Amino acid sequence: MKLAYWMYAGPAHIGVLRVSSSFKNVHAIMHAPLGDDYFNVMRSMLERERDFTPVTASIVDRHVLARGSQEKVVENITRKNKEETPDLILLTPTCTSSILQEDLHNFVESALAKPVQIDEHADHKVTQQSALSSVSPLLPLEENTLIVSELDKKLSPSSKLHINMPNICIPEGEGEGEQTKNSIFVKSATLTNLSEEELLNQEHHTKTRNHSDVILADVNHYRVNELQAADRTLEQIVRYYISQAQKQNCLNITKTAKPSVNIIGIFTLGFHNQHDCRELKRLFNDLGIQINEIIPEGGNVHNLKKLPQAWFNFVPYREIGLMTAMYLKSEFNMPYVAITPMGLIDTAACIRSICKIITTQLLNQTATVQEPSKFIYPKATSLEQTNILETSQKETILKDNPDSGNTLSTTVEEIETLFNKYIDQQTRFVSQAAWFSRSIDCQNLTGKKAVVFGDATHSAAMTKLLAREMGIKVSCAGTYCKHDADWFREQVSGFCDQVLITDDHTQVGDMIAQLEPAAIFGTQMERHVGKRLDIPCGVISAPVHIQNFPLGYRPFLGYEGTNQIADLVYNSFNLGMEDHLLQIFGGHDSENNSSIATHLNTNNAINLAPGYLPEGEGSSRTSNVVSTISSEKKAIVWSPEGLAELNKVPGFVRGKVKRNTEKYALQKNCSMITVEVMYAAKEALSA
């Protein structure tokens, strides 16, 4: 634990709540003091959904500290089970409430042992006589109103609209036509036809019923952050329900007839996760692969037992889902793909990895003589269709003609050829990023410096994309996922000048200020740093604010995601002389662009204070790194000729030229910056 002004990854309980609120009909109870219960507000603000966040805070106050927490926690679990009837209730403490060192496992067991009281004030038994005397108000009946019997109720229009209409009791000896049409009260038929024993059984079923599943999040809140806790919680839930199905002997591990996949790791508050999920669905549909399950977003916990039926698992983000995929791999020998399809090269590598898994699965199915397998490409891919030979056909061929042992290998080669054709078609004719990277507009970005920072998945993928596909020099690539530092270094090795592994945003800001890149690609915090330093920033990773939860379709994965990234990269850089031309001809933002020049022209000679910073750079630790003047405790004087020459520099690079000249003057111990010093600084920098 540490006290921080701002954090990239939040505390562990935030990750637990993100996973629980992603599932359908799962409720989370957070055992926490006031101040830790901000998740509801945060999710309601960022995720533009209609449903309420299914999280309840069991507040730890002075009364709880005096009496103990068990009574309140058990009461909240029982109450939510009665009100919400969820499939699963997930209990989690926070790092603050964990200090109490309470036995929450015992709380869960106590809640499971306690029956659910539906009506705590019902102390009398419902008898048949009381049921017969129950009446319900009803509007006057028209002559053409149908008398609906219990048998026909399912077919009535009112039942289709889920209207709870009581049936009308017709006295013995009277027909339907003799029913009084102006009845104001009729007897309710809900309990009329039940015997006394059935009434008692119904009363017992109403007052007590089985509990929802209750799980205590198995997370060390002192040692893991938000992302690690989310990964662990998802694996815990999957393991719980698969183990439950194994104990009940209802776990079906038979593979689906056609290739299928589980997408693991799409969850709430993720960076463009909803859009990425749609793009992945389209990608797998083009490849002829069915979606078996998507977890946790929109998933049902009772469907988790179907996970082993898929041919393989796909983990788009390393931050969540990798532990679940590894568990399914160890338990059921299910292969998984963890290559993020971000950029043309990585997307092609991901598809080839999927192709390898599918062909391997087909070989295994043929060896074990399972059900006949077929693999058909849809027409949407514009590729020729192919059918895998059925197992019985292969056996007949091999028996009748021993020399035809290459039939299966030929079929596998055909599948690989089709996958390669799909990659080629998407890269050359569908995706716009390939030809754009060879256009003159993108070539103008070649050699420009950029800094990339974010989570391990997006930062590594973005670094490789910029270096390999767009020719941009990545001066520094970094991540705040310190637990995945080794993998990150391996991925970005050879694609950047230096690597930064830290979760301290001030270090990232200092590094950006020292490198002075042409653009930044990072999180919401890097956007703030870019605004202070007047450096454009493109957001490519969580944590982000509401503007990066767009309503429109903006994926970052797949071929459409590559188009979006190309637009983001190009629009993040300053477009050449645009700012300078706007300043010359009086554009809409010429006032801002000429701010430095206006300030310099107000005085013929300016004695800059030690803490002076150009406009747009606030008094922060990051901004202080921009100029070494403050650290050297020296004052620099600009001559009138030097100021006039500096004013001739285009506005969009004037601040950078000014800082470089001042650094050179400090190194050479020049007390006044003249025109000669400026040109000497330029030559030294060019060399």
Swiss-Prot record:
The keyword Secreted does not apply. Its main location: plastid. Substrate binds at residues 576-577. Its cofactor is [4Fe-4S] cluster. GO terms for molecular function: 4 iron, 4 sulfur cluster binding; ATP binding; metal ion binding; oxidoreductase activity, acting on iron-sulfur proteins as donors; oxidoreductase activity, acting on the CH-CH group of donors, iron-sulfur protein as acceptor. The keyword Chloroplast applies. Its EC number is 1.3.7.7. Protochlorophyllide reductase is composed of three subunits; ChlL, ChlN and ChlB. Forms a heterotetramer of two ChlB and two ChlN subunits. This is Light-independent protochlorophyllide reductase subunit B. It comes from Chlamydomonas reinhardtii. The lineage of its organism: Eukaryota, Viridiplantae, Chlorophyta, core chlorophytes, Chlorophyceae.
